[in-house]
């Protein structure tokens, strides 16, 4: 147990002197059987506790199910009782309403019989009344039928009358034209407003640009003044340093005169002092230069910080897209470079536009030449086709003329032969005509009488037809007049109901004409 908790532990421990060993005591032996028995008892206790918990849960579940079953039975019985009461009440109310209705019908029937007895209406009067009622119903139905027929005829007239449809189409087209004019005016107004807004924005942009240029000029003047003041201060410092140097130089010259009058040892000492002084002066000069450089750097740093602060303030105030650099000179160079690039871009753009225009002109010329070539080709083909057609027509005409000449020659021969046969026949008929002359004269007189009778009958029929045509013409004029009156009446009472309203009219109903 001990070894399991602390690992393997050496029992022998070396002492303070050689061959001196200390032995650790053995740990007490664990009572394994008791621990095992305790574990078994603990597991049995846990098992019995789990069984008891399961039994308790099962008992609670059965109890809950029993309670739910009882609640469901109670609710079902309660619902059935309430439904039964409601049905009985409904049946009772229905019976009461039926009884009341029976009593009301009986009372109305009694009143009707009483009224009939008071009126003492006879069968003839009743028949007359029924006939009048039937006549009125027939007249009403006939009127409804006539109205329906008139409505359908009017509808058929509206659908089939081309003149009415043309008039309605003209009215609709006129309304559409008016709406289109109003829409065009509305679009022109929108364009004008857009132009005004663009002019206003360009004016504001120009004012903003001028204000920015004024601020930049003011800032540039302020920077120049600051640089000038700094330069003057630095010049004053340099002048003071030069004065100090001149004073030191004069002191050095005086010391040199004193050193020349001394002996060699003093001269050596003076030389050493001189070297020390020169070193000191160099250190002073280096310190002064370093201080001057640090001051210049500090002023430049302050200037840069001030420039950065001004840049941040300008960016926050104007929301500008350009970032200014720490020095105005660099900014001017950038502006010049950008302007130069912009001019180069404009020149390049101009050259590209010129090249595009030249290319477009070349393409147009090429297209024009191509079209002219195609047109010349079409004209040439058309001319050749016309010439070929003319040749074919001339050939056909020539053949027709030849055929006609041949046919005429043949007909002339046939006529000559026919004339000869006719002459022979005439000679034969002359004798027959002399014999039949008297008979033909009598037949001619009879035929003349029949012709006169036919002419009279035809003249009478013609007069009757003319009279009939006149009556039909007058009826047609009357029908045309009624037709035009009907069209005008429909047009005067016609009211166009737009089924498909234009989106512009729907969106701007107050601005467009009705």
Swiss-Prot record:
InterPro entries: CFAP53/TCHP, TPH_dom
Stored Pfam families: TPH
Gene Ontology CC: axonemal A tubule inner sheath; axonemal microtubule; centriolar satellite; ciliary transition zone; manchette; sperm flagellum; spindle pole
Locations listed in the record: Cytoplasm, Cytoskeleton, Cilium axoneme; Cytoplasm, Cytoskeleton, Flagellum axoneme; Cytoplasm, Cytoskeleton, Microtubule organizing center, Centrosome, Centriolar satellite; Cytoplasm, Cytoskeleton, Spindle pole
Annotated tissue distribution: Expressed in trachea multiciliated cells.
Swiss-Prot/TrEMBL keywords: Cell projection, Cilium, Cilium biogenesis/degradation, Coiled coil, Cytoplasm, Cytoskeleton, Developmental protein, Differentiation, Flagellum, Spermatogenesis
GO biological process, one term: determination of left/right symmetry
Stretches of the chain forming a coiled coil according to its record: 207-429
Family to which this protein belongs: Belongs to the CFAP53 family.
Self-association state and partner proteins as the record states: Microtubule inner protein component of sperm flagellar doublet microtubules. Interacts with PIERCE1 and PIERCE2; the interactions link outer dynein arms docking complex (ODA-DC) to the internal microtubule inner proteins (MIP) in cilium axoneme. Interacts with CCDC38. Interacts with CCDC42 and IFT88. Interacts with centriolar satellite proteins PIBF1/CEP90 and PCM1. Interacts with dyneins DNAIC1, DNAIC2 AND DNAH11 and with ODA-DC component ODAD4/TTC25.
Function: Microtubule inner protein (MIP) part of the dynein-decorated doublet microtubules (DMTs) in cilia axoneme, which is required for motile cilia beating. Regulates motility patterns of both 9+0 and 9+2 motile cilia through differential localization and recruitment of axonemal dynein components. Required for centriolar satellite integrity and non-motile cilium assembly. Required for motile cilium formation. Through its role in beating of primary cilia, involved in the establishment of organ laterality during embryogenesis.
Name used for this protein in its record: Cilia- and flagella-associated protein 53
């Amino acid at each position: 147990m001990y070894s399991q908790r602390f690992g393997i532990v050496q029992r022998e421990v070396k002492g303070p002197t050689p061959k001196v060993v200390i032995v650790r005591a053995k740990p007490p032996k664990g009572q394994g059987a008791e621990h095992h028995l305790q574990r078994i008892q603990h597991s049995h206790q846990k098992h019995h506790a789990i069984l008891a918990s399961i039994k308790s849960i099962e008992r609670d579940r059965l109890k809950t199910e029993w309670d739910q079953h009882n609640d469901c039975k109670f609710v079902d019985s309660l619902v059935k009782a309430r439904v039964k009461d409601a049905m009985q009440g409904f049946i009772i109310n229905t019976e009461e309403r039926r009884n009341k209705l029976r009593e009301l019908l009986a009372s109305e029937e009694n009143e009707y019989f009483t009224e009939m007895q008071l009126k003492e209406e006879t069968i003839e009067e009743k028949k007359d009344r029924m006939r009048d009622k039937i006549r009125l119903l027939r007249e009403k139905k006939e009127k409804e039928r006539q109205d329906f027929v008139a409505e359908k005829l009017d509808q058929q007239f509206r659908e089939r009358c081309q003149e009415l449809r043309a008039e309605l189409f003209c009215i609709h087209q006129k309304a559409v034209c008016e709406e289109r004019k109003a829409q065009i005016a509305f679009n022109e107004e929108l364009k004008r407003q857009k132009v005004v807004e663009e002019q206003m924005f360009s004016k504001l942009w120009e004012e903003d640009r001028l204000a920015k240029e004024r601020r930049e000029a003011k800032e540039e003047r302020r920077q120049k003044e600051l640089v000038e003041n700094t330069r003057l201060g630095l010049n004053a410092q340099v002048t003071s340093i030069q004065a100090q140097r001149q004073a030191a130089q004069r002191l050095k010259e005086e010391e040199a005169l004193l050193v020349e009058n001394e002996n060699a040892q003093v001269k050596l000492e003076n030389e050493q002092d001189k070297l020390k002084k020169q070193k000191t002066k160099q250190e002073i000069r280096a310190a002064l230069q370093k201080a001057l450089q640090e001051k210049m750097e500090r002023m430049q740093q302050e200037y840069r910080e001030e420039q950065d602060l001004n840049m941040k303030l300008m960016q926050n105030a104007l929301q500008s897209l350009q970032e200014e650099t720490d020095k105005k000179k660099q900014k001017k160079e950038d502006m010049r470079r950008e302007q130069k690039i912009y001019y180069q871009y404009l020149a390049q753009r101009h050259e590209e536009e010129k090249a595009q225009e030249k290319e477009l002109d070349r393409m147009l010329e090429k297209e024009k030449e191509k079209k002219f070539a195609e047109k010349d080709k079409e004209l040439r083909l058309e001319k050749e086709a016309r010439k070929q057609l003319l040749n074919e027509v001339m050939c056909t005409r020539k053949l027709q003329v030849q055929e006609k000449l041949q046919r005429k020659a043949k007909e002339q021969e046939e006529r000559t032969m026919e004339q000869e046969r006719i002459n022979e026949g005439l000679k034969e008929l002359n004798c027959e005509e002399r014999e039949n002359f008297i008979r033909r004269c009598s037949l001619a007189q009879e035929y003349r009488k029949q012709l006169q009778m036919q002419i009279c009958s035809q003249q009478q029929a013609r007069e009757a037809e003319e009279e009939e045509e006149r009556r039909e013409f007058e009826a047609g004029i009357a029908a045309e007049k009624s037709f035009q009156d009907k069209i005008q009446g429909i047009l005067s009472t016609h009211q166009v109901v737009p089924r498909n309203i234009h989106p512009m009219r729907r969106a701007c109903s107050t601005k467009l004409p009705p």
